[in-house]
C-alpha cells in the first residue's frame, strides 16, 4: 500500500464515477499524444490506457514510478521520472493533450510553466483546487481576478466541467476540487505582444493589489502614458481586462 506523501501534495482520486466523468470529458483517441501529470496510483492512467495504445506520464515519486512500471510495459506507458515544473513538454511533440489530478501545492506554478508550451498543446484537462479554478475563470473587477486569470485567459479558452467533493480522494483534502478544460486560442485570437514584457506588466500591476496602477506601474509608465492609452491611473489592477494589459504592453514596446 502506498502512503500518500504530504510533501508531494498527494491526494489520490478513488471515486470511479468522477474518474469516468473526467475520462469521458477528455475522450482520448488512438493516435493522439496524451500526457498525464502525476499519475499517482493510476486512477486516471488505467481508464486512459483502456482507450489508448500508449500514454506518457510525468511522475516525481520514485515509489509510484516503480509501481507503475510493474503495472504496464514501457510500450504502453512511457514514464518520465522528474518534476513536472521542470519538464520540457515540448520534447513530446505537437498537438499534445495534457491531463492530470494536479498536486495542489504546485498547481499554480505548473500552470504558469505550461503557458510556454501553449502553441504545442491541443487541450488540457485538470483536476484542481476549486479556489484555483475560480481564479482561472474569474472576470475583471472581482476578488478572484488576478495575475493567474489574465495570463491564462490571454492564451486559453477555459471551461469549468464539474465539481469534485473531498470524499472522492484518499486522504480527503480540506478543500473542494473542480475539473477544468483549457483549449489554446488560435493565433488570430491572441494579439502579438512581447510575452516577457506582458508578464512583467501583469506581475507589477498585481504585486500590491490594494494600490492603484499609478503606484504599481510607476517603474514602467509615466503619467502621460496613461493619458495616451486612455487608462485611468487611479484604477486598481483588477479593473483592467486582458486587452488592456495587451495594449499597455504594445505601447511600452514601441515607446
UniProtKB/Swiss-Prot annotation:
<feature type="binding site">
    <location>
        <position position="11"/>
    </location>
    <ligand>
        <name>S-adenosyl-L-methionine</name>
    </ligand>
</feature>
<keyword id="KW-0489">Methyltransferase</keyword>
<dbReference type="InterPro" id="IPR001737">
    <property type="entry name" value="KsgA/Erm"/>
</dbReference>
<keyword id="KW-0694">RNA-binding</keyword>
<feature type="binding site">
    <location>
        <position position="38"/>
    </location>
    <ligand>
        <name>S-adenosyl-L-methionine</name>
    </ligand>
</feature>
<protein>
    <recommendedName>
        <fullName>Ribosomal RNA small subunit methyltransferase A</fullName>
        <ecNumber>2.1.1.182</ecNumber>
    </recommendedName>
</protein>
<dbReference type="InterPro" id="IPR011530">
    <property type="entry name" value="rRNA_adenine_dimethylase"/>
</dbReference>
<dbReference type="InterPro" id="IPR023165">
    <property type="entry name" value="rRNA_Ade_diMease-like_C"/>
</dbReference>
<comment type="similarity">
    <text>Belongs to the class I-like SAM-binding methyltransferase superfamily. rRNA adenine N(6)-methyltransferase family. RsmA subfamily.</text>
</comment>
<keyword id="KW-0698">rRNA processing</keyword>
<dbReference type="Pfam" id="PF00398">
    <property type="entry name" value="RrnaAD"/>
</dbReference>
<dbReference type="GO" id="GO:0003723">
    <property type="term" value="F:RNA binding"/>
</dbReference>
<dbReference type="InterPro" id="IPR020598">
    <property type="entry name" value="rRNA_Ade_methylase_Trfase_N"/>
</dbReference>
<feature type="binding site">
    <location>
        <position position="13"/>
    </location>
    <ligand>
        <name>S-adenosyl-L-methionine</name>
    </ligand>
</feature>
<feature type="binding site">
    <location>
        <position position="59"/>
    </location>
    <ligand>
        <name>S-adenosyl-L-methionine</name>
    </ligand>
</feature>
<keyword id="KW-0963">Cytoplasm</keyword>
<dbReference type="GO" id="GO:0052908">
    <property type="term" value="F:16S rRNA (adenine(1518)-N(6)/adenine(1519)-N(6))-dimethyltransferase activity"/>
</dbReference>
<feature type="binding site">
    <location>
        <position position="101"/>
    </location>
    <ligand>
        <name>S-adenosyl-L-methionine</name>
    </ligand>
</feature>
<feature type="binding site">
    <location>
        <position position="83"/>
    </location>
    <ligand>
        <name>S-adenosyl-L-methionine</name>
    </ligand>
</feature>
<dbReference type="GO" id="GO:0005829">
    <property type="term" value="C:cytosol"/>
</dbReference>
<dbReference type="InterPro" id="IPR029063">
    <property type="entry name" value="SAM-dependent_MTases_sf"/>
</dbReference>
<dbReference type="InterPro" id="IPR020596">
    <property type="entry name" value="rRNA_Ade_Mease_Trfase_CS"/>
</dbReference>
<keyword id="KW-0949">S-adenosyl-L-methionine</keyword>
<keyword id="KW-0808">Transferase</keyword>
<comment type="function">
    <text>Specifically dimethylates two adjacent adenosines (A1518 and A1519) in the loop of a conserved hairpin near the 3'-end of 16S rRNA in the 30S particle. May play a critical role in biogenesis of 30S subunits.</text>
</comment>
Amino acid at each position: 500500500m502506498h502512503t500518500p506523501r504530504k510533501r508531494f501534495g498527494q491526494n489520490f482520486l478513488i471515486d470511479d464515477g468522477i474518474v469516468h466523468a473526467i475520462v469521458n470529458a477528455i475522450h482520448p483517441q488512438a493516435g493522439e499524444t496524451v500526457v498525464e501529470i502525476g499519475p499517482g496510483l493510476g486512477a486516471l492512467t488505467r481508464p486512459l490506457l483502456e482507450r489508448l495504445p500508449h500514454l506518457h506520464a510525468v511522475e516525481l515519486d520514485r515509489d509510484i514510478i516503480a509501481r507503475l512500471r510493474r503495472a504496464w510495459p514501457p510500450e504502453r506507458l512511457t514514464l518520465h521520472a522528474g518534476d513536472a515544473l521542470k519538464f520540457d513538454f515540448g520534447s513530446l511533440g505537437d498537438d499534445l493533450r495534457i491531463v492530470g489530478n494536479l498536486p495542489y501545492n504546485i498547481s499554480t506554478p505548473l500552470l504558469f510553466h505550461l503557458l510556454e508550451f501553449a502553441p504545442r498543446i491541443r487541450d488540457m484537462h485538470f483536476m484542481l483546487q476549486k479556489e484555483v479554478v475560480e481564479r482561472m475563470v474569474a472576470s475583471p473587477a472581482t476578488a478572484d481576478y488576478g495575475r493567474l486569470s489574465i495570463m491564462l485567459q490571454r492564451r486559453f479558452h477555459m471551461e469549468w466541467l464539474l465539481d469534485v467533493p473531498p470524499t472522492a480522494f484518499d486522504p480527503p483534502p480540506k478543500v473542494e476540487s473542480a475539473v477544468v478544460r483549457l483549449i489554446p486560442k488560435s493565433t488570430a485570437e491572441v494579439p502579438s505582444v512581447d510575452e516577457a514584457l506582458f508578464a512583467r506588466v501583469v506581475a507589477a500591476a498585481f504585486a500590491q493589489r490594494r494600490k492603484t496602477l499609478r503606484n504599481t506601474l510607476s517603474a514602467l509608465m509615466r503619467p502621460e502614458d496613461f493619458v495616451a492609452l486612455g487608462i485611468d491611473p487611479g484604477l486598481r489592477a483588477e479593473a483592467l481586462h486582458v486587452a488592456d494589459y495587451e495594449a499597455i504592453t504594445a505601447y511600452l514596446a514601441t515607446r
